[in-house]
Amino acid sequence: MPFLFSTARTAAAVALAAMLAGCAHPITMITETAPPRSPAYLVPKKVAYVMTDAQRDQQVTTAGGSGDRVSYYPYRDLEKSIRDALRAVYRDVVVLRTAGDARSNEAAGVSLVFTPRIATDSSSSSWISWPPTNFTAEVACVVTDAAGAEVTRVRATGNGTAEFGEFKGDFGLAARRAATRLTAQLSSEIRKNEKLR
């Protein structure tokens, strides 16, 4: 009889360990930091970025530490970063649900439309904690005029790192650092592209 209880306890412990190892911990990439916005140097244009509800609801799962995984919503979390990057360059920024409505774009005075594609990845060098210690976020934007003709493309990447001792309950720290760098680089790439002035 003790053998049966011992076997049952061992099986339960193995099942629990397997279940915990396979879970995905939620984190967020939203950053409070934005590039500086100097009204005297803003391009006097109204621009838009495209973000659909389906994109905002898209959940992604990537690697964390100790065999665990992390889950987050890249479009929802990075929407503020994209908007902040555009607001650092242009006078007026709006959001569209679709890029294809040329008449509405022209009527609204939109001169450029940014359609972003986001890719992310994470990893961890830690075997004792689950938060990612390395995070990469990349945004690639196709930029069109109000009628839908492609003007140019811009790309930006942000890499973030965080060590175990830095987390202090802030488990998405590496992701937020990546988002902050992505925002600054996207703003810089837009500003130096002559086709986007």
Segments and roles (model prediction):
Residues 1-23:
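Sec-dependent bacterial lipoprotein signal peptides
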Residues 18, 42, 108:
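Structured loop/turn residues at beta-strand edges in well-structured enzyme cores
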